[in-house]
Swiss-Prot record:
Gene giving rise to this polypeptide: SHKB
Keywords: Amino-acid biosynthesis, Aromatic amino acid biosynthesis, Chloroplast, Plastid, Transferase, Transit peptide
Enzymatic class: transferase
Tissue specificity: Leaves, stems, tuber and roots.
Residue intervals passing through the bilayer: none
The organism of origin for this protein: Solanum tuberosum (Potato)
Principal place of residence: plastid
Family that this chain belongs to: Belongs to the class-II DAHP synthase family.
Name the record gives this protein: Phospho-2-dehydro-3-deoxyheptonate aldolase 2, chloroplastic
Subcellular location: Plastid, Chloroplast
């Protein structure tokens, strides 16, 4: 397919370059073994991560269980401690779910995002469940993340780092330890790896054997994701065809048609240059997993010492984050996380004091290593415009390197007239726009977006071009916790973000 103008040719070339950068040929995708490097090491930078250096510990000696000396919030109370210990010993003997080299590779990519040279797309279920576990659901979420990543990559002309809230995102913090229905109070549902969502006394008792089931489900999910990422399902041509189909069947498809067809033209150029669908660059992709580091006994049981660096990695996921409710400076969760070498996320709301954020980053990343810390901001559009700039200035003033990411979901949860929790697409979009506006104002880099979403055609968030109304919520409301964007809403959001990335890129090029 011939390209008709210089802009298309330039975009095509940039897409090739960014795809090559994101998928270097010599390194196998989703390697089952730690990544090894040969020759002279690169110095630490946001682009090239050096050989991992041991984390400096300022608050006493760290150990795998030093978190037990701190106050631990949001942890369940198991009725039989001996049974819990038996389960944890079994997990300690099981193979790791991910490897240190994979986590280091992700950290290097996130370091690029901190400098505006890459963009993080992190998404998946609010909470994975045993009941909804099947290959089709995993495939559909992976597919929509692929579609979104291609759109974002073309808009920003930078690599897109794909990280799923998958293969371990079970446990959920709760604001109230008890749930009341019709005058009956029971312990709150905390996620399928802790207790059951059925409202009866037996289901709500924490069961340690659920940890084994969660581990097995995570392993199966990872196995399928690896197959999808390397087996041809992620082929660029296939993903582009899916996006073109979305545009043709979308009520507001005209808004996105130009970008979708430019991507298609770029693929024509790449094919003419020899990058056909059979080329590994065009048929495989990198993909990482993440979840909230909440259930510390489980995380400790899956932490392993890396033989190549001597560092400890939480091998339950490539990336883990500390939540808004568990990020206390002197708390157990921060104590555990400061000693593992994975890239870490920090969830931040409007309640975060700038000085507290600086202290927290210093505890978790005293060496100021690029890619180590991702600050995931969740506060609603109005608070974003008022509060985020203070956080950005404080972190920059302290000389700290972080990747700024927008979570437009958690600050926009409302209750519908029918009683179900929902989120409005327009509110989500408003927070994303506020995030970009603040970074444009501050001269900092918007490093990514973090979404609760699914590849299913659910009706949990209202709005979007294929409008979901309050009346529609009950028809396909399947979430076990918070409302998620459906496939159409997720892809629509990615087109809007891609256009914002394109505008940012064009304005930067003119400077």
């Amino acid at each position: 397919m011939a390209l008709s103008n210089t802009l298309s040719l330039s975009s095509s070339k940039s897409l090739v370059q960014s795809h090559l950068l994101h998928n270097p040929l010599p390194q196998p995708r989703f390697s089952l073994f730690p990544t090894t490097q040969h020759g002279r090491r690169h110095p630490i930078s946001a682009v090239h991560a050096a050989e991992p250096s041991k984390t400096a510990v300022k608050q006493g000696k760290w150990s795998l269980d030093s978190w037990k000396t701190k106050k631990a919030l949001q942890l369940p109370e198991y009725p039989d401690e001996k049974e819990l210990e038996s389960v944890l010993k079994t997990l300690e003997m099981n193979p790791p779910l991910v490897f240190a080299g994979e986590a280091r590779s992700l950290e290097e990519k996130l370091g690029e995002a901190a400098l505006g040279k890459a963009f993080l797309l992190q998404g998946g279920d609010c909470a994975e469940s045993f009941k909804e576990f099947n290959a089709n659901n995993i495939r559909d979420t992976f597919r929509i993340l692929l579609q979104m990543s291609v759109v974002l990559m073309f808009g920003g002309q930078v690599p897109v780092i794909k990280v799923g809230r998958m293969a371990g995102q079970f446990a959920k913090p709760r604001s109230d330890p008890l749930e009341e229905i019709n005058g009956v109070k029971l312990p709150s549902y905390k996620g399928d790896n802790i207790n059951g969502d059925t409202f009866d006394e037996k289901s709500r008792i924490p069961d340690p054997h659920r940890l084994i089931r969660a581990y097995m489900q995570s392993a199966a999910t990872l196995n399928l994701l690896r197959a999808f990422a390397t087996g041809g399902y992620a082929a660029m041509q296939r993903v582009t065809e899916w996006n073109l189909d979305f545009v043709e069947n979308c009520e507001q498809g005209d808004r996105y048609q130009e970008l979708a067809h430019r991507v298609d033209e770029a693929l024509g150029f790449m094919a003419a240059a020899g990058l056909t669908v059979d080329h590994p660059i065009m048929s495989t992709t990198d993909f990482w997993t993440s979840h909230e580091c909440l259930l510390l006994p489980y995380e400790q049981a899956l932490t392993r010492e890396d033989s190549t660096s001597g560092l400890f990695y939480d091998c339950s996921a490539h990336m883990v984050w500390v939540g808004e409710r568990t990020r206390q400076l002197d708390g157990a969760h921060v104590e555990f996380l400061r000693g593992v070498a994975n890239p870490l996320g920090i969830k931040v709301s409007q309640k975060m004091d700038p000085n507290e954020l600086i202290k927290l980053i210093d505890i978790l990343n005293p060496a100021n290593k690029p890619g180590r810390i991702t600050v995931i901001v969740r506060m609603g559009a109005e608070n974003m415009r008022v509060k985020l700039s203070h956080l950005v200035r404080a972190v920059r003033g302290a000389g700290q390197i972080v990747t700024w990411v927008c979570d437009p979901m958690h600050g926009n949860t409302i209750k519908a007239p029918c009683g179900l929790k929902t989120r409005a697409f327009d509110s989500i979009l408003a927070e994303v726009r506020a995030f970009f506006d603040v970074h444009e104002q501050e001269g900092s880099h918007p490093g990514g977006i973090h979404l609760e979403m699914t590849g299913q055609n659910v009706t949990e968030c209202i709005g979007g071009s294929r409008t979901v109304t309050y009346d529609d919520l009950g028809s396909r409301y399947h979430t076990h916790c918070d409302p998620r964007l459906n496939a159409s809403q997720s892809l629509e959001l990615s087109f809007i973000v891609a256009e914002r990335l394109r505008r940012r890129r064009m304005s930067t090029q003119r400077l």
